[in-house]
């Protein structure tokens, strides 16, 4: 990024799940905590955005984090116009506190193991009952393979939308 002056801003929305799969599947990460892996991921970027409604387990909010003072100043000046002061970004104190707690919980090895484990359990059960799903099973949801589930519906008749409407 320094050589070409192109900043990398990472969308951190599912970072805990990604860190979990790195921990489980990549050599050399087996003994590292989710928190350590997330910190390493962040070290490769110039900043990050996050919708806290996903991994941070809250119903509102998100954030922009940068490690460049000039970018911070520019963002701080813009947030006043759109969201409120930079100290709270339009969020109530209770929402910021919940987000802080949620971020901490989201990088807990026990939490993410249980959460991803539930998804894997559901995916395996669906497979056991011959429901065609997209594989490999991910960390936040199971996707029914609509083409295989409704093979009589041609692609140009939108099998996925048909399945969603029927459900």
For the regions a language model picked out, list residue spans one by one.
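Short glycine-rich, basic-tinged beta-strand/loop micro-motifs
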Residues: 141
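Active-site loop ensemble at the mouth of alpha/beta enzyme cores that anchors a bound cofactor
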Residues: 147-167
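Conserved PLP-enzyme active-site core in the AAT-like
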Residues: 1-133, 144, 154, 161
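Cationic-aromatic interfacial patches
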Residues: 137
């Amino acid at each position: 990024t320094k050589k070409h002056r192109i900043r990398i801003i990472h969308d951190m929305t599912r970072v805990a799940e990604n860190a979990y799969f790195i921990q489980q599947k990549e050599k050399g990460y087996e003994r590292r905590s989710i928190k350590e892996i997330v910190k390493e991921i962040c070290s490769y970027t110039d900043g990050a955005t996050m919708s806290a409604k996903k991994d941070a387990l809250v119903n509102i909010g998100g954030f922009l984090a940068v490690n460049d003072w000039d970018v911070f100043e520019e963002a701080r000046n813009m947030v006043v116009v759109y969201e409120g002061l930079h100290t709270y970004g339009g969020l109530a104190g209770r929402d910021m506190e919940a987000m802080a707690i949620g971020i901490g919980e989201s990088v807990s090895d026990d939490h993410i193991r249980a959460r991803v484990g539930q998804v894997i359990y559901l995916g395996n059960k669906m497979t056991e009952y011959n429901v065609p799903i997209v594989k490999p099973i991910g960390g936040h949801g199971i996707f029914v393979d609509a083409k295989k589930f409704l093979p009589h519906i041609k692609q140009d008749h939108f099998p996925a939308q048909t399945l969603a409407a029927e459900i």
